[in-house]
């Protein structure tokens, strides 16, 4: 039986590819998709969800827009990474359907309430919508199987020296998620920076030759340009968000550890840092499964295999 999931995202090139991977995988049943502000403004990320589902011919999936700003802060966006539209590069179709007439939290709550079994929440943007759901619907916590997030790092940040972008945008929300008592799986930069797509991988995807694989290749063409900056030391572009979906499909591709994770909300230099108690230096019990390594070639092979679904 397919695993029911609820996807909360802020497309974003890598979010878009995570959607492609999820909807090409019969092991997963995508119940709804909600959008958050982050990689671009809330209006643009919502539109990008609708554009991707129009491309994939999955306008049957309910969509709702989420919070327009973080819980306690002003919004920061990553337009320098994802371009003016949030999905610069390919020519994507205009949406042929509208979002639901409700908020992201209302759609999430409805989805959980109506599901016969607990739902896995996959959150690949800031954690604002998920935190609002947890705070406003404590009665639904038992309907959440786990929360799989792309965010954080045990080491270096990518937005500040200490913080990864998604967590930095709304650290208070991320702290609510990590301390919720619900199982959390963290795909942080430690693993996503190893999930790099090289130029030859992009050409492999392009050669599959269907409209979706071509769009994915064009998304990666744009994404690779930003990551060519020598400061990163990358060979290709790190495909952050699809690691969450890939872990659900093939956990054997990933090395994980069970650790306690907290989020720094106050530090002068460290706001948004995920503090991982790797060496068990506190009495805090582990609250997260933390990804630390990935079989890069296996990850690329999985993407290539699933892109053939769209032939």
UniProtKB/Swiss-Prot annotation:
Q: Which UniProt keywords apply?
A: Glycosidase, Hydrolase
For this record, the Gene Ontology CC terms, alphabetical, are:
cytosol
Q: What is this protein called?
A: Pyrimidine-specific ribonucleoside hydrolase RihA
Functional summary from the UniProt entry = Hydrolyzes cytidine or uridine to ribose and cytosine or uracil, respectively.
Write down the top EC class of this protein. Answer: hydrolase
Q: PANTHER family under this entry?
A: INOSINE-URIDINE PREFERRING NUCLEOSIDE HYDROLASE (PTHR12304), URIDINE NUCLEOSIDASE (PTHR12304:SF4)
> Which gene carries the instructions for this protein?
rihA
**A GO molecular function held by the record:** uridine nucleosidase activity
Q: Where are the transmembrane segments?
A: none
Q: Which family does it belong to?
A: Belongs to the IUNH family. RihA subfamily.
**Record's superkingdom?**
Bacteria
Do you know which SUPFAM superfamilies this protein is assigned to?
A: Nucleoside hydrolase
Q: Which GO terms describe its biological process?
A: nucleobase-containing small molecule interconversion; purine nucleoside catabolic process; pyrimidine nucleobase metabolic process
EC number, UniProt record: 3.2.-.-
Q: Which InterPro entries does the UniProt record give?
A: I/U_nuclsd_hydro_CS, Inosine/uridine_hydrolase_dom, IUNH, Pyrim_hydro_RihA, Ribo_hydro-like
List of catalytic residues? 240
